[in-house]
């Protein structure tokens, strides 16, 4: 028995999120079907994170166990030949049995790509978020700065979130303008369900002048989801960054997507 780690990228459009579904519409369903075809046996994969419907991954890392001996290229090119458009294997590595795609990760990162332009996206529809009014990036960064550190993020937690604790350590919250796009980066030891999209909803209100920067810290301190802004759309959210202990020697990000 050997354990294989695989790096993936995918568009969330057209899938019911990452997790396997009874109607087989999850990205996981497509990946397991393709890997099983190459392995010649039923394969179950475990992912670093479970993205929601419409959320993308510039890098998702999964592992699986198999008795089938294949060259690593088979787990890349062979699996890709069985995957639908919008999903691709980037690389494959053999890892030891101690590696676990979910539990061995000690940091994850998301990037929200937001088109800030009066006209809605056409070519990038479904791949970026959108806000039509000018956004003040400096105000958004001032608002986000006090969130860095270990806090109770209950105010940004979805009602259906299954995390045991709302306390997370946010290590990065940084917004950068690149032409008409805002690239909004978040890194933490873990994320609550809808946490990034709920933060984005608040930051966009602040950037548009609807709220002062101090409001975001007040929402955080209040720990009340009803005091925060509505959840922002899924379209612009990407899983981008997964860190493991150095001994596993796995890439922690991908530079090949256009918003890297």
From Swiss-Prot:
Reactions performed catalytically: uridine(38/39/40) in tRNA = pseudouridine(38/39/40) in tRNA
Binding site for substrate: 110
Cystine connections: none
GO molecular function, one term: RNA binding
A single BP term in Gene Ontology: tRNA pseudouridine synthesis
Residues annotated as transmembrane: none
Keywords for this protein: Isomerase, tRNA processing
Organism domain of life: Bacteria
CDD domains documented for this protein: PseudoU_synth_EcTruA (cd02570)
Pfam families the record matches: PseudoU_synth_1
EC number, as in UniProt: 5.4.99.12
Catalytic residues in the record: 52 (nucleophile)
InterPro entries: PsdUridine_synth_cat_dom_sf (IPR020103), PsdUridine_synth_TruA (IPR001406), PsdUridine_synth_TruA_a/b_dom (IPR020097), PsdUridine_synth_TruA_C (IPR020095), TruA/RsuA/RluB/E/F_N (IPR020094)
Function text: Formation of pseudouridine at positions 38, 39 and 40 in the anticodon stem and loop of transfer RNAs.
Family: Belongs to the tRNA pseudouridine synthase TruA family.
Binding partners and assembly: Homodimer.
The name this protein goes by in its record: tRNA pseudouridine synthase A
